[in-house]
Amino acid sequence: MVQVEEYERFVGAETVQRVKEKARALRGLRVAHVNSTYYGGGVAEMLAPLTLLMNSLGIKTEWRVIQGSPDFFSITKKMHNALQGGDINLSELKREIYERVVYDNSIRNDLDHDRIVVHDPQPLPLINHCEKKGPWVWRCHVDLTSPNSEMWSYLSSFVEKYDAVIVTLEEYAQQLQTPQVFFMPAIDPFSIKNRELTESERQSRLDYYGIPTDLPLVTQVSRFDSWKDPEGVIRAFKLAREEVD
């Protein structure tokens, strides 16, 4: 398990010491992170090392995952997209399926922790069904710049019951009674995805795809859909070409 001291070469000793001091005030607390999957996607990738790191700092941290039917995950995928401005037909049946699955998960999960952090919209209504022993925080990982109004009107009724909301940027803040804080995500430099490649590994990949190395090289890695802004990547490439030929 990676210890916090091993991050010094990336963030500096002062930052690591500050993390230790902040963690000391939380030592002994029971914390639970709740999301919808153990693998796939950025949230799961973030929670895996974060849970281990928090435990190594003396914060008793668990990671709970809700379960659901294919219909549930189809609905929450559309909700996820609607929070980013996409269209959605939020029928009464869809709401019933969504809320029923979350209720069923509240029965299966004993969330009596001192702190609960719920990630993204999938587990959001859990707060309606669990006895609060301490603060609940909703961590929204999506772009809330211009959410679908119908979607936000529905979900905000749950959000308002939380003690705090964490969003990535100030531009994502919404009109809420609940306090909002802004916290940018980070990568784990020790994950397989982010590890440094050897020179032979790099050259092998470049040769395989026929990528020349006589010019500066920048990569953008994401799935190919509108929410990852592939058109923006092309525009960025054109701007870069104006500077580097």
Locations of the language-model features?
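Catalytic cores of nucleotide-sugar-dependent glycosyltransferases that transfer UDP/GDP/TDP-activated
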Residues: M1-D245
